[in-house]
Amino acid sequence: MDAPAATAKAPALPQADRSQLHSLLFLLVPVAIVALLPLLPFVNNYIIAAVVRALIFITLGQAWNVVAGIGGQLSLGHGVFLGIGCYTTGILFNKYGIPPWIGMWAGVLISLVFAFVMGAMTLRMRGVFFALATVAVSLAMVQISRHFVDLTGGADGLALKFFGDSLWAMQSRTPAPFLYAGLVLVIIYYAISRWILASTFGLEMQAVRDDEVAAAAAGVAVFKTKITGFVVSAMMTAIAGTLYMQFYMAIDPEAAFGLSQAIQLQLPALMGGLGTAWGPIIGGAVMIFLSEVTNWGSTKLGIEGLDILVYGLMLLVVVLRAPKGVVGLLPKAMQRGVR
């Protein structure tokens, strides 16, 4: 006799739905933990500020991951768009009183135009030639920003006028508001990354990344795909640049356009896992944890530059032993949830 319908097992979720459920659960847990941090009595402003720094570099890693991880274009000069976001917001606020909420979109527009022009000149190059071309642009921007002293502050940089706790000026005496702003931006960028990976455009980007000739033969508009990904990534970087500027309250040419900054914003994606939505998030968390530990070790041991040494060693280990990043080291079942 057949079992009653009421006792029949529910049908299993399709693989795609289970993967989305895993991703949602993996996202909700850290989001809840971070959101509750300011409410915990044992969490001070130093810890919150460290988490904000992590969130900022996660967003920068997420932006770079679009062009380099998903699109396969190794831009080593992406700090240019961080600098554009920072300087545009700061100059408009200091000189004209335009709030960062509006200045941010001006930075996005300038980054869009600059990325289109820069991409048109460099994206027909491949591999190391493209990477070196982006480095050249970055180094040129360092010199340009030093030259216009009245506008950018020259080598000394640009410091924001401080208005205290002000939503209009996007400023606060405590880091907690930046924690929530950074968390929201990380979630938005995660959603954008997931959408790109699942879209036809994302598949075209990955096809170009894997084999440009084969992608072109399959009907993919290679150059259009590359420059679109480059522009989207640049705009995302500029928005993160506004958050960077408002949190740190100052910027200088090296911090904005320098090669060391450009490399640092790549580390979250490289350590976490290139081409995945979760990679920059995991990599950014690992980076800041290591940074805080090594800073403490540097103070205790009196060794300067310990954090740079640890970053270098970690990157070497990832390249040699885990080319897919931390995500690639996770068990197969967990990897489905963090792609």
What are these regions (language model features)?
Residues 1-339:
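Transmembrane alpha-helices and adjacent helix-loop boundaries
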